[in-house]
Amino acid sequence: MKILLLADQAEPTLWEHLNRKRLEGVELILSCGDLPAEYLSFLTCFTNAPILYVHGNHDGRYAKKPPEGCICIEDTIYVHGGVRILGLGGSMRYSRGEHQYTQKQMAQRVNKLRLKLWRSKGVDILLTHAPAWQLGDETDLAHQGFVAFRDFIEKYHPQVLAHGHVHQSYHYDFARVRDHAGT
C-alpha cells in the first residue's frame, strides 16, 4: 500500500504548486499534526485516499475548524485495506496549550486502549505527533518523546511508528528512519 505521510510543514509541491503526480497511486494519507486544516482539506479534493490525522501541539484551531473530509483517529484504531492504524496525538506538556500531555497522562491514554489493542491483535502503524522517548526526540521539554510510546513499541511491535514534531528543519543530520525493537 502506498501511503503519503505528512507532518508539521505543508509541502509546496502539494499545496502551492500542486503536482498531481505526487498523489498518483496514494491509497492512504496520514497526518502527524501541526498542519493547517485548509491544507488537509485541499488535499481531499485531489485524491480518493482517506486522510487520517492526529493533533499536533499547535492544532487547537481544529476545535473551531477541523480539516473537512478528513478523519481524526485520536485514541482509535482505524483499519484501511487491512492495515491497522492507532492515533495518539499531542506533545509533551510544556505550556498551557491544547494537545499537550505529561508522561503520566500519555501513559494513561495508552493504558485505556488495551482492550481495543487486544481485540484488534495489535496495530501495524502507530501514528503520533511526538516521538518516542530517546528515539528521535530532543532534550528540551517541548520536544521530548513519550516513554509510553517506547513501551508501546516494545510491547506491541507495530511495523511503523510515524511521528512529526521533531524534523529535519531542526538540524541537517536528523535521521528520518530508525529501528527499535523491530519497529
Set out the residue ranges of the language-model regions.
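Conserved catalytic scaffold of divalent metal-dependent phosphoesterases
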Residues: 5-14, 55-144
